[in-house]
Amino acid sequence: MPSKDPESVIDKEIRKISARNDELIKQDGTLKREYTTLLRKVSSVITVLNSIDDADTGSAETELPRLISQATVEKVPELKWYNDQISLITEKLEDDEDIEVPEELMDAYTLYKETPLLYNDTHTP
């Protein structure tokens, strides 16, 4: 029975790893395109919600400008959780507590900031 040449085994492993790397690079590109599409849609929805909020009550009427207005929370009760989270973060910032941001979240934030949006995504017609 012939023995396998160690160099051919190494070459085969290198080709396999290289092919996997190429596949992951393609997946990364696809995911970034999908993320851009999702971000554009979310930005459009936020713009519409802000215009509804401005028309109903005005964002300046909330105790903390960064909170979602009570009128909007009444329309969509699931948003109350987000107001609770915003309040929690605001309290920590007021008490000068450090907030640890995970590396994955920093990567997502960097990707968010580097994603180009169209003018219409952030402006109502």
UniProtKB/Swiss-Prot annotation:
Entry-linked InterPro entries: Ies5
Pfam families named among the record's database cross-references: IES5
Compartments it resides in: Nucleus
Domain of life, source organism: Eukaryota
GO cellular component term, pick one: Ino80 complex
Modified residues (Phosphothreonine): T124
Biological process, per Gene Ontology: chromatin remodeling; DNA repair; regulation of DNA-templated transcription; telomere maintenance via recombination
Coiled-coil residue spans: none
Keywords: Nucleus, Phosphoprotein
Subunit structure: Component of the chromatin-remodeling INO80 complex, at least composed of ARP4, ARP5, ARP8, RVB1, RVB2, TAF14, NHP10, IES1, IES3, IES4, IES6, ACT1, IES2, IES5 and INO80.
Miscellaneous note of the record: Present with 2280 molecules/cell in log phase SD medium.
Protein name per the record: Ino eighty subunit 5
Organism: Saccharomyces cerevisiae (strain ATCC 204508 / S288c) (Baker's yeast)
